Amino acid sequence: MNVKRSLSLAGHRTSLALEPEFWAAAERLAGERGQSLAAFVLDIDRTRGDRNLASAVRVAVLAHFTAPVSLAERAYS
């Protein structure tokens, strides 16, 4: 079941509905980047083109967690 949250993106309020797992992953990625969740979503919003924002967030999260990990990164994980 999707969870709806309201975020302020560049001064505009918007609502976004994602599965709890995607919210958790987006929050984790934002934290790793030293960003707020809103700043993380805004970065995605600025590059999504005509794609639905919720879909763009899901794709960004999925792309991060399915990207190949270098051997050096694996050694320190």
Where would I find each of the regions flagged by the language model?
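Short, charged, intrinsically disordered terminal tails
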Residues: 1-3, 67-77
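Short, leucine/isoleucine-rich alpha-helical interaction segments at C-terminal helix-coil junctions
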Residues: 60, 64-68
